């Protein structure tokens, strides 16, 4: 009897660890204004959830998309994603801070952000028609010790947040910002990488004219990309950030180059991407009509610890084995 109850307790705690361990973007701060993301631990269970800029998903287990699904629409904005009803205004050159609920420190990997022009209202866009341009990317920062310091570690150190600068030269219009962490803690195994894509709607303003050519979401990665199938538990002389090349018009942020490596002497390698004009033929795009989010939606952001199991043990049980849980 006692051993049965200990096993049951262990199972419940393991489930709680899995649910609470992975994160999602719960809040977005744009030029000082806060907007709610899609609260996947709450909204799916409400009969009338609020309209937000974040895309809805069915990933209530806070799970991931693996490489077997790279040609599936789920890789675009997560499981069964549908567009957010609202868009948040941001000026070209402005910043977007994406605040995650949490992120496990064992889940090392790159942080990548893309923009895709909706060419209309993002609330009704067909996600499979979106072409994504990489505007921000950071991967391996320091390989002094295995498994190294990664962009995900910087995100954790920044209170589980990541700031993306909207390129100054991008043409105005309605865009989807696709923001993603790729966890590589199991990536030495085939299909072991874990993608956690998050999408929000933006209405970009400004006088830019650049309309760079993008890549469909289902073509961003392959299971054998060197930055996807990789063993981070050995010293890496090179790490190639997955996906298309960083756009030349991306903001002048310090990022890990898509082709640069941490040096053999274990000195952190950080390159600054220079601001340059897009090589694509520029065109002026006027924003289509959209529903703009104007209010701060703070009341819908719940506590991170939204799932806390309650376990009652009526018998006195002596446990001599330490039970540990692992976040997968």
From Swiss-Prot:
- Reported pH dependence: Optimum pH is 7.5.
Which of this chain's residues are annotated to bind O2? 185, 194
Signal peptide positions (record): 1-21
Give the GO molecular function terms.
Answer: monooxygenase activity
Q: What is this protein called?
A: AA9 family lytic polysaccharide monooxygenase A
How do people use this protein in biotech? Lignocellulose is the most abundant polymeric composite on Earth and is a recalcitrant but promising renewable substrate for industrial biotechnology applications. Together with cellobiose dehydrogenases (CDHs) an enzymatic system capable of oxidative cellulose cleavage is formed, which increases the efficiency of cellulases and put LPMOs at focus of biofuel research.
Q: How is it modified after translation?
A: The catalytically essential N-terminal histidine His-22 is post-translationally modified by methylation to prevent protonation of the histidine side chain, and protect the critical active site of the enzyme from oxidative damage.
EC code: 1.14.99.56
Q: Where in the cell is it found?
A: Secreted
Q: Which GO terms describe its biological process?
A: cellulose catabolic process
Domain comment as written in the entry: The extra C-terminal domain (residues 249 to 328) participates in protein stabilization and protects the enzyme from thermal unfolding.
Report which superkingdom the organism of origin falls in: Eukaryota
What does this protein's UniProt record list under function? Lytic polysaccharide monooxygenase (LPMO) that depolymerizes crystalline and amorphous polysaccharides via the oxidation of scissile alpha- or beta-(1-4)-glycosidic bonds, yielding C1 and C4 oxidation products. Catalysis by LPMOs requires the reduction of the active-site copper from Cu(II) to Cu(I) by a reducing agent and H(2)O(2) or O(2) as a cosubstrate. Shows activity on cellulosic substrates (Avicel, carboxymethylcellulose) and xylan.
Disulfide bonds listed in the record: 77-199, 118-122
* Major site of localization recorded for this protein: secreted
**Residues with PTM Methylhistidine:** 22
Residues reported in the UniProt entry to bind Cu(2+) = 22, 107, 196
Instruction: Provide the cofactor list for this protein.
Output: Cu(2+)
Q: Which residues cross the membrane?
A: none
């Amino acid at each position: 009897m006692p051993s049965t109850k200990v096993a049951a307790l262990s199972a419940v705690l393991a489930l709680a660890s899995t649910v609470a361990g992975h994160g999602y973007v719960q809040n977005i701060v744009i030029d000082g204004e806060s907007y709610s993301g899609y609260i996947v631990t709450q909204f799916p269970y409400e009969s009338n959830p609020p309209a937000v800029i974040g895309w809805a998903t069915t990933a209530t287990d806070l799970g991931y998309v693996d490489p077997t699904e790279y040609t599936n629409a789920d890789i675009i904005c997560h499981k069964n994603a549908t567009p957010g009803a609202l868009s948040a205004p941001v000026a070209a050159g402005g910043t977007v801070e994406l605040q995650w609920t949490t992120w496990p420190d064992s889940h090392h990997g790159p942080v990548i952000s893309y923009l895709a022009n909706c060419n209309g209202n993002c609330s009704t866009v067909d996600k499979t028609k979106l072409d994504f341009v990489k505007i921000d990317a950071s991967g391996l920062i320091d390989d002094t010790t295995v498994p190294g310091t990664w962009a995900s570690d910087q995100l954790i150190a920044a209170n589980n947040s990541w700031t993306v600068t909207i390129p100054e030269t991008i043409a105005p219009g309605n865009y989807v910002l696709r923001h993603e962490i790729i966890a590589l803690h199991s990536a030495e195994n085939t299909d072991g990488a874990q993608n956690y894509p998050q999408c929000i709607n933006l209405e970009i303003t400004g006088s830019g004219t650049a309309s760079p050519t993008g890549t469909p979401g289902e073509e961003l990665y392959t299971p054998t990309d060197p930055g996807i199938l990789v063993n981070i538990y050995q010293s890496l002389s090179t790490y190639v950030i997955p996906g298309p090349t960083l756009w030349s018009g991306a903001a002048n942020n310090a990022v890990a180059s898509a082709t640069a490596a941490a040096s053999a002497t274990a000195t952190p390698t950080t390159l600054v991407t220079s601001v340059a004009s897009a090589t694509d033929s520029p065109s002026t795009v006027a924003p289509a009509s959209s529903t703009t989010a104007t209010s701060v939606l703070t009341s819908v952001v719940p506590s991170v610890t939204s799932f806390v199991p309650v376990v009652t043990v009526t018998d006195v049980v002596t446990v001599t084995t330490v039970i540990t849980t692992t976040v997968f």
